[in-house]
A protein has these predicted regions:
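A short helix->loop->beta-strand "cap" motif at the edges of active sites that frequently abuts
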Residues: 113, 200, 284-288
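Non-cysteine beta-strand/loop elements that form the S-adenosyl-L-methionine
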Residues: 45-46, 156, 253-261, 292
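Conserved beta-strand positions in the central sheet of alpha/beta enzyme cores
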Residues: 83, 117-119, 155, 203, ...
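H/E-rich (His + Asp/Glu) clusters that bind or coordinate divalent metals
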Residues: 275, 282, 289-293
Length: 323
């Protein structure tokens, strides 16, 4: 066992010890996902990697790239699935026209690409009940959009991303963490209940906000306690001394992923060790798509196509080495 692996294992055991009640007292709704057949996963794409180009196209259709262009990128690189972030659909936050949904569904199908998910912008951290209610309404709407697309997952946030993970306290109006988690869980449970009616899972992302550690992620999911709610594991947003340990704790609850090129979504943090990450995902028994989401991180020369291809190569090689 390598030194890094040994450290991660020790921290995994430490983090697991912090959440004993999650395993001991919750209902059957909150439990490790029952997967059969052994681990089997492949790196895919989250469209957000092309953020700047997609936004440019929304502002001026003659510029940048649209979602159809993102699908073409998947074809070029033999990527089997794409997570089509809601923000990049025309008219967001409104539901796209049926004609547009039908076009993108047919376009992906004809090219052998699966639409693996979508996502919205919401704020369930705020003390403002009206804003939370708007987030529930938005999430429910996009659950229905996801169902139309044939996408099994809608990604949601705990709240808006903060420069400092502790800044959520300001948005929460001074409420305690327990109180915020309660009202957040109430909102997410309502969304998950709606998701169950449409066969769409609500995936809560750790986004460097209210959810910045594995134990925080587990605690919220336990409180939501709904079979149609799970974790979107963002490998670049567990702000701890050993993010790999947090990732390992979350694999049994993962319903979607965002694989980042660095561990802290910043050029100041270590590059992701894809071999370590792949082994953690494998050892956790995960089956399914593992979308890559790269970030500009302030780089003026950021090339999303090249960055995604770099991470894709690293993940594919790491997975192949597991055999």
């Amino acid at each position: 066992m390598s030194t890094a692996a040994a450290i991660t294992r020790r921290n995994f055991l430490r983090i697991s010890a912090l959440t004993p009640l999650a395993a001991a007292t919750s209902s059957k709704a909150f439990a490790p996902i029952q997967r059969t057949g052994g681990p089997f996963f492949t790196p895919t794409l989250n469209a957000y990697s092309f953020l700047e180009q997609l936004n440019a196209n929304l502002a001026d259709p003659t510029k940048g790239i649209d979602l159809f262009g993102v699908v073409d990128f998947c074809v070029k690189n033999n990527i089997l699935a794409v997570d089509l972030t809601g923000y990049f659909f025309p008219g967001y936050p409104k539901a796209p026209a049926d004609s547009y949904l039908n076009r993108i569904k047919r376009y992906t199908h004809d090219r052998g690409i699966t639409i693996s998910g979508t996502g919205v912008k919401n704020d369930f951290t705020t003390a403002d009940k009206a804003v939370r209610a708007e987030g529930v309404t938005l999430t429910k709407l996009w659950i229905e959009v996801a169902a139309r697309l044939g996408a099994p997952v809608v990604r949601v946030f705990a709240g808006p991303q903060q420069k400092n993970p502790k800044d959520w306290q300001g948005a929460a109006g001074g409420a305690s963490r327990d109180e915020v988690e309660k009202w957040m869980a109430d909102s997410l449970r309502e969304c998950a209940e709606h998701g169950g009616k449409f066969g769409v899972i609500v995936a809560v992302q750790n986004h460097g906000d209210f959810i910045s550690t594995g134990p925080e992620h587990i605690s919220l999911l336990k409180r939501i306690d709904h079979e149609w709610c799970g974790a979107l594991v963002d490998t670049g947003k567990y702000f701890t001394d050993d993010p790999y340990a947090d990732i390992a704790v979350m694999v049994p609850h993962a319903v979607n992923w965002q694989v980042k090129e660095t561990l802290g979504s910043s050029l100041k943090t270590p590059r992701t060790d894809f071999k370590t990450l792949a082994k953690i995902i494998h050892d956790g028994g995960y089956r399914g798509f593992v979308p890559i989401e790269t970030l500009a991180m302030g780089r003026k020369d950021y090339n999303p196509a090249a960055e995604v291809e770099m991470v894709l190569k690293g993940m594919r090689e790491a997975i192949a080495a597991l055999d």
